[in-house]
Amino acid sequence: MSRPRKRWRDVDGVFLLDKPQGMSSNDIMQKVKRLFQANKAGHTGALDPLATGMLPICLGEATKFSQFLLDADKRYLVTAKLGERTDTSDAEGQVVETREVHVETPQILTALEQFRGDILQVPTMFSALKHNGKPLYEYARQGITVEREARPITIFELNFIEYHAPFLTLEVHCSKGTYIRTLVDDLGEVLGCGAHVTMLRRTAVADYPVAEMIPINELQLLAESFPLSELDRLLLPTDTAVSKLPALHLDVEQSKAIGFGQRVKFANEQQLGGQVRLFSAENLFLGVALIDGNIIRPQRLITQSA
């Protein structure tokens, strides 16, 4: 007897997943999508299979705002093994160089200083960045090295946690586009012994609370035991994806015009500029707009239910 076909549905919000080790971000996102029976889903910045931790999954209308989380600051806890370099700069790769480790804590503290603040970083070949329409990791798997330009990133914090040779643990608060594997590889070169990542955990994306993260096995159990309405209670509101933007509340007429995608004039007593979150007179999240003087220009809007 064939199983009844799942009914996919419109469900909106952000699910804070505690990603397990060993799965790709896309595979785990698809699993979350199936458990919620959601029509649409998207993640907000891939974690390597080796990595664990916070992976916000946007469902439904929240996918329209996933770019804001891709662009958000992130925090990581990382353990590096000194003395070995690998082709992927993590423990999943092949060891390509081994060196003796004669490194003490004071040397590490000094070396860390040059990686704080605004720096340039050359992305790893084992990344999803594209060259001529093809991901770099595909070239890398063929043994081809492509010249990459250094990109500006910001390391807001780089904190020493502990060092028990050859293992070094650090805490990193960084801007978008930062490759922790590359950071560790570069640090290993400065220390003169090489290094690669053995453990990586993302501890924060934007301002999302760590306490709200849910492991996939827990979500699976809930999905097997409770109706979908109980799963929906785990979702954070869609507007949390853009919580960094200032809020602008509209009156009834302004809300109606924005709903039609029209530009709206307003007094702009708060002297707002740039992007804002829009809320209706009933305090419903409408989307994101650009403020240009006293004009509200809609950019990304929620599709309102009939």
Swiss-Prot record:
NCBIfam families: TruB
Keywords: Isomerase, tRNA processing
EC number, as in UniProt: 5.4.99.25
Similarity annotation: Belongs to the pseudouridine synthase TruB family. Type 1 subfamily.
Catalytic center residues: D48
Keyword tRNA processing: yes
GO molecular function: RNA binding; tRNA pseudouridine(55) synthase activity
An example Gene Ontology biological process: mRNA pseudouridine synthesis
Gene3D superfamilies the UniProt entry points to: Pseudouridine synthase, PUA domain
Any one Pfam family match given in the protein's UniProt record, by short name: TruB_N
CDD domains to which the protein is assigned, alphabetical: PseudoU_synth_EcTruB, PUA_TruB_bacterial
Catalytic activity: uridine(55) in tRNA = pseudouridine(55) in tRNA
Protein name: tRNA pseudouridine synthase B
Cited function: Responsible for synthesis of pseudouridine from uracil-55 in the psi GC loop of transfer RNAs.
Organism: Haemophilus influenzae (strain 86-028NP)
